[in-house]
Regions:
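Hydrophobic structural segments
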Residues: 1-130
Length: 131
């Protein structure tokens, strides 16, 4: 895991941090919000392993002082998902994984996932915070 306010290079996985000023709603006395950017290899179709990895990264980021952790596009399912998006069981598996992630406290998580409804499948992001 690296803590680097100016890094944008990919590594073997971990969390990079950046700070931004916030007018309101900051969780700390400085008025800053610290963002963690998760970089890791998420396995295509392995929602359980990806969920476990995301939990570990979120907890690690929180312990290093992050207020928000941002995961990559479709991190929950892995990229590129290809024909996995056509499976009827996908929606239920994704909802279960998001529910499992939502119980992590004291950090906001932005999680890329495929949202399925009667209009189709959409590349989406969930914002999870304290359940």
């Amino acid at each position: 895991m690296s803590k680097d306010n100016n890094s944008n290079s990919a590594d073997k996985g971990g969390v990079n941090h950046a700070q931004a000023n916030a007018d309101t709603g900051a969780n700390n006395a400085t008025g800053n919000v610290t963002f963690a950017l998760a970089q890791s290899h998420f396995l295509v179709g392995d929602i359980n392993t990806n969920t476990d990895k995301m939990r570990k990264l979120a907890i690690e980021a929180r312990e290093q002082g992050a207020d928000v952790i941002i995961f990559p596009e479709l991190a929950l399912l892995g990229y590129p998902p290809q024909d996995l998006l056509l499976r009827p069981s996908l929606s239920g598996r994704v909802k279960s994984a998001l529910s499992a992630l939502s119980d992590i406290e004291n950090i906001v998580m932005i999680v890329g996932y495929p949202h399925v409804d009667h209009h189709g499948t959409f590349n989406s992001a969930a914002i999870l915070h304290n359940g």
